[in-house]
Amino acid sequence: MDTSYLYSYNAERYQKLAERKLPCREKLNTTEVEQGYLLPNRFAKNRLFGCGGVLDAEKNYVKASEMNAYAKYAVPVTAQDEKEIYLGEGYAIDDNKVEYLDEEIIYLGYINNHWGHFLIDCSTRLYYYLEHMDENHKYAFLVNENEDYQAIAPIRRFFELLGIAECLIFIHKVTKCKKVIIPEQGYMINAYYSKQFLHVFERVAESVDCSRYPSYEKVYYSRNQFRKAKGTEIGENILLDLFSKNGFKIISPEQLTLDEQIAVVRNTKLLCGIVGTLGHNMLFAKPEQHMILVNKTHNINVAQMDINKMKNLDMTYIDSYLAKFPSLIGNGPFLITYSEMLNQYVESHNWKKPAEDVISETVLKRNLQEYEEMYRSRNLKNLRLVYERTRTDLIILHRIIFWNLRCGFIIWNILRR
């Protein structure tokens, strides 16, 4: 992993994580629960996903059904570190509303329609299917309580390529089963991985005939057609101009089928994109493929660091952002700039620089203003959700936030002169 193009305070953090070994688990356990209850996901403030999982016949929660991670630790994990619980804890159930399945059910955890979470969180028990394909089992994903879940196209195609599509059921009501078999997670963020977990992605990728699709020397994954990115990221036009000038094919992955996305990953020598879910697609890559990820925040995507190790990727990180205000990695907003680190990469590789009209001071000021306005609107919404303020309180908070942001912008401009 090349960290030469990271800000100095970031480089040390990345290097420490890169040096940490990610253990490869050879044996994965299973837990069997007779007359177990499947609990669909119920919203909980202190969980990434919520409450849900499996209860035993006496309605005690089965810890093996939790979904866990160590994603919040941007440093090597120790035995004393507490696991994050993405899905966990039971809840009271009404026996009169419980459905019953007189079958053995394989528990797969929770699923939603976020592609990134599907790849690294929701797929971790699918390996069990590959090891028991000759057995006539049903495989159950939990979905949100009372939700009529319909998988998005890439997830649906993933199941088809794996061969499990016809075996799946989605649990949106409390359901009691003759037996529930709970495979252990095949991968836990920042804790361990397994060959079994990787076999799932190898099986899916090998089910696509990549020879039917074009091959590329260099591809840049753009997010400018991604709806969420339009509301959280500013300045990608700098990268679009830079990479198009230097021979990269510009591709918007959300406009491709899963087969096409897999073919792009496996048929391209050098892939590049902004850090995020795009990099997680490298789970479909061949070992030792080369990728460049441009950072939009100081927050480290720990799952991506794991993927780099699992697939032995030739990864280069470049810092090219201005973080004027704190923001969560999944929230934003993010301001992408033509940083000194990106310029160093461009010069060291004899690349053409972006056009002046996308990296000028005038453009930077305009992007900064848009960034401030976006930050203000997004965080005002967060205040409304968290504190449930009245309209009058929100107007006062809006004025305070606006004043502080404007003062910060004025001070920043004075310091730059």
Locate predicted features:
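The feature primarily captures lumenal catalytic ectodomains
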Residues: 1-414
